[in-house]
Amino acid sequence: MKVISSIQALRDQLRGQNRVAFVPTMGNLHEGHLSLMRLARQHGDPVVASIFVNRLQFGPNEDFDKYPRTLQDDIEKLQSEGVYVLFAPTESDMYPVPQEYRVDPPHDLGDILEGEFRPGFFKGVCTVVMKLFCCVQPRVAVFGKKDYQQLMIVRRMAKQFALPVDIIPAETIRAEDGLALSSRNRYLGETERAEAPVLYKTLHEVRDTVLGGDGVDLLAVEADALARLQARGWKPDYVSIRKQDNLQPPTREEFAAGAPLVVLTAAKLGATRLIDNLEI
């Protein structure tokens, strides 16, 4: 596996490759990331991964400098998965001059849910993903469903800019007790780790209630889930039932007609903020 930091060197290495499958990451890789590499290999060849901790998507109260950087360990994991190239640019490689042009997602998708609680986050995500697509020029790119809103935003961005890349969704990888794998899990203490699977259990309870029959009050279901998490010591930002296609709340008519739904949540357990979702 070649490790490349320069955009020009990356383009030279990939010249003539027209079936590149790309997996962008911020490093600190775990089994969930590695599953994305395996899925990428099913859709293209060669597989290219990137590791770049993107300052643009960190808010003023989010510590960019403390984000875990484990490059050597990540390199070994990617080598074991047969990745062809790791693009690991420095900040000066990626942004040799200040990034004055940004990609701003539409408000109806970028300023809700995660976007409401992390203002500017998706603008930073879209900007770096667009730039990575320009650097790598993949035929397919794999994004995990764990970051469901990010997947929807990137998919819409690719479509509206007519980018020649297919966005492939990857199922969330979970621990045996249901906790979604995440780089943030390392911050959970022993007691918190034992409590953490309750978040996924709560999503299942929401789904079971929604599927339980006609006349379900979705707002009441959301409020009940929030209250139950709060009673256990969580600090939830949201539990929200949305349509899968555009992440808008379903109307009564859409719900009655069986519109595909997803329940999404973000909540703090101690100092660790976890996100998860479950399709209904």
Curated annotation (Swiss-Prot):
Top-level taxon of the source organism:
Bacteria
Q: In which pathway does it act?
A: Cofactor biosynthesis; (R)-pantothenate biosynthesis; (R)-pantothenate from (R)-pantoate and beta-alanine: step 1/1
Q: Which GO terms describe its molecular function?
A: ATP binding; pantoate-beta-alanine ligase activity
Q: Which residues form the active site?
A: H33
Q: Where does the protein end up?
A: Cytoplasm
Give residues annotated as binding ATP: 26-33, 144-147, 173, 181-184
| Amino-acid positions noted as binding (R)-pantoate in the UniProt annotation, renumbered to this chain | Q57, Q150
- Could you state one GO biological process linked to this protein? pantothenate biosynthetic process
Q: Which InterPro entries match?
A: Cyt_trans-like, Pantoate_ligase, Pantoate_ligase_C, Rossmann-like_a/b/a_fold
Pfam families reported for this sequence: Pantoate_ligase (PF02569)
UniProt entry tagged with the keyword Glycoprotein:
no
What GO cellular component entries does it have?
Answer: cytosol
Q: Which UniProt keywords apply?
A: ATP-binding, Cytoplasm, Ligase, Nucleotide-binding, Pantothenate biosynthesis
Main localization is cytoplasm
The catalytic activity of this protein is classed by the Enzyme Commission as 6.3.2.1
Which amino acids does the record list as binding beta-alanine? Q57
> Which HAMAP family does the protein's record reference?
PanC
Q: What else is known?
A: The reaction proceeds by a bi uni uni bi ping pong mechanism.
**What functional role does this protein have?**
Catalyzes the condensation of pantoate with beta-alanine in an ATP-dependent reaction via a pantoyl-adenylate intermediate.
Could you give the subunit structure recorded for this chain?
Homodimer.
Q: What is this protein called?
A: Pantothenate synthetase
Q: Which organism is it from?
A: Cupriavidus metallidurans (strain ATCC 43123 / DSM 2839 / NBRC 102507 / CH34) (Ralstonia metallidurans)
